[in-house]
Every structure is written in C-alpha cells, then in structure tokens.
Swiss-Prot record:
InterPro entries: RidA_CS (IPR019897), RutC (IPR019898), RutC-like_sf (IPR035959), YjgF/YER057c/UK114 (IPR006175). SUPFAM superfamilies: YjgF-like (SSF55298). Keywords: Hydrolase. It comes from Escherichia coli O157:H7. It catalyses: (Z)-3-aminoacrylate + H2O + H(+) = 3-oxopropanoate + NH4(+). Homotrimer. Belongs to the RutC family. GO terms for biological process: nitrogen utilization; uracil catabolic process. The lineage of its organism: Bacteria, Pseudomonadati, Pseudomonadota, Gammaproteobacteria, Enterobacterales. Pfam families: Ribonuc_L-PSP. One of its GO terms (molecular function) is deaminase activity. This is 3-aminoacrylate deaminase RutC.
Length: 128
C-alpha cells in the first residue's frame, strides 16, 4: 500500500519540507506539531496548557482526516523546553487520552521558535 499525504483543511504551510501527516499500511505518522497560527507564529506564549491543547487539537485533525480517532494513538514523542511546565502539559495531555494511554517519551530541549513550549509527534494505528 503506498503512502498517502495527510493535510487537513486549513493547515498552514510548514516551515520546512514536510507535511502534517502521512498514512501507510493503516499507520498515521503525525509530524512534530507546535502551537502555530496560519502564519507559523507561536500562539499562547507562556501558557503551556493552551499550547498543549492547540497542539493536540491539531494532531486530532490530522488523525481524523486520515480516518482515525485519538483512541487510535499508540505513541507520542513529546519535546518540552522547561521541566517547570511538565505538570501543566500532562494535565492537558490527559484530557485527550482519558482511557488507555499511549506509550510516549518526553525530553527537554530547544524548539524551532523561542516562544514554543511543547512539540508533539504522534503515531496512530487506524487499520481495522
């Protein structure tokens, strides 16, 4: 099965040569996602909960465009700029995964824009 490019309606053009997601063999791979507006400006500077919510809503759009749901998420890679935001990010993250939680990792690192606090890349298995 060839891969399909997943670009939800209203998506902004990425800052680099990539797409929001790809679908191959029933697996959705969602690119690293930040809290950007349509012009790739960071939204909600200094608000880790709002950034996390925006990131996960964007990820949900990619997965739903591919035909899945957030319940299909099997793995998240989480990148944060400061451990002081870890609890706030987890609080919002848990709202999107109320049942069985996906596997994940979380590391502290620098991100592509100074006001970005969290970036998440996701894998979801939607094959039935």
């Amino acid at each position: 099965m060839p891969k399909s490019v997943i670009i939800p309606a209203g998506s902004s053009a990425p800052l680099a040569p990539f797409v929001p997601g790809t679908l191959a063999d029933g697996v959705v791979y969602v690119s690293g996602t930040l809290a950007f507006d349509q012009h790739n400006n960071v939204l909600f500077a200094d608000d880790p909960k709002a950034q996390t919510r925006h990131v996960l809503e964007t990820i949900r759009k990619v997965i739903e465009t591919a035909g899945g749901t957030m319940a299909d998420v099997t793995f998240n890679s989480i990148f944060i700029t400061d451990w002081k935001n870890y609890a706030a990010i987890n609080e919002t993250y848990a709202e999107f995964f109320p049942g069985d939680k996906p596997a994940r990792f979380c590391i502290q690192c620098g991100l592509v824009k100074p006001d970005a606090l969290v970036e998440i890349a996701t894998i979801a298995h939607i094959a039935k």
